[in-house]
């Protein structure tokens, strides 16, 4: 009945032990050479309780025996332009464009919304129901907030583009370049209103840039 249940016969055991040679080791060696890694899990896990794993015997494509590798990607390097170090680490003009425009837009949106709320509270009709009072305040908030936020975002977007262009042409970033970019941005923003509004806008944006540069310089020196 050994042929039915697959039991080994004495003839099989005798053939396996002919000449006192173990035929399993050559088979494992040839299999390891063909696969390129250790196929026997018993040779990988060793030590008391089988808790130690020899990573050098695992698949070579996994690279587990090389330790920790740190990637140094060029796109992750910070900007090396002279004077370009700011309050937030920046990789170039694209980061300045995104961060600067987004921050100024949110700031303008918040200030405009707060201003609209104050105006709405002052203009609430007397003896009006609660829904009308709430609607009045919300109307002023949605009117002033997006208006100031959009204008501030346009100014910041134009300023960052002009400032980055000036820095690229001069090869450095400094206060003079920022003030010049602010003056050009203000003049461009009111270019359709005439020379006098252009002058006022140019002076105001240039003054704001000068104040920002002085504040940033003080913060970086601390």
Curated annotation (Swiss-Prot):
Its main location: mitochondrion. The chain crosses the membrane at residues 97-118, 145-166, 175-189, 197-215. It comes from the Eukaryota. Keywords: Membrane, Mitochondrion, Mitochondrion inner membrane, Protein transport, Translocation, Transmembrane, Transmembrane helix, Transport. GO terms for cellular component: mitochondrial inner membrane; mitochondrial intermembrane space; mitochondrion; TIM23 mitochondrial import inner membrane translocase complex. Residues 1-25 are annotated as: Disordered. It is found in: Mitochondrion inner membrane. Belongs to the Tim17/Tim22/Tim23 family. Essential component of the TIM23 complex, a complex that mediates the translocation of transit peptide-containing proteins across the mitochondrial inner membrane. PANTHER family: SD19278P, TIM23. Present with 1440 molecules/cell in log phase SD medium. Component of the TIM23 complex, at least composed of TIM23, TIM17, TIM50 and TIM21. The complex interacts with the TIM44 component of the PAM complex. NCBIfam families: 3a0801s02tim23. This is Mitochondrial import inner membrane translocase subunit TIM23. It comes from Saccharomyces cerevisiae (strain ATCC 204508 / S288c) (Baker's yeast). The lineage of its organism: Eukaryota, Fungi, Dikarya, Ascomycota, Saccharomycotina. The gene is TIM23.
């Amino acid at each position: 009945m050994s042929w039915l249940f697959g039991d080994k016969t004495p003839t099989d055991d005798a053939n396996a032990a002919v000449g006192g040679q173990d035929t399993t080791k050559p088979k494992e060696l040839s299999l390891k050479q063909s696969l390129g890694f250790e196929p026997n899990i018993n040779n990988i896990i060793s030590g008391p309780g089988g808790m130690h794993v020899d990573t050098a015997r695992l698949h070579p494509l996994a690279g587990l025996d090389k330790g920790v590798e740190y990637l140094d990607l060029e796109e992750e390097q910070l900007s090396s332009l002279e004077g370009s170090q700011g309050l937030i680490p920046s990789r170039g003009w694209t980061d300045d464009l995104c961060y600067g425009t987004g921050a100024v837009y949110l700031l303008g949106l918040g200030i405009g919304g707060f201003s609209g709320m104050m105006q709405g509270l002052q203009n609430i009709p007397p003896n009006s129901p609660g829904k009308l009072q709430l609607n009045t305040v919300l109307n002023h908030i949605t009117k002033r907030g997006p208006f100031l936020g959009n204008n501030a975002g346009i100014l910041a977007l134009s300023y960052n583009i002009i400032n980055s262009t000036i820095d690229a042409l001069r090869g450095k970033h400094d206060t003079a370049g920022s003030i010049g970019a602010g003056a050009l941005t203000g003049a461009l923003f009111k270019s359709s209103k005439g020379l006098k509004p252009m002058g006022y806008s140019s002076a105001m944006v240039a003054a704001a840039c000068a104040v920002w540069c002085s504040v940033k310089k003080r913060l970086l020196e601390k």
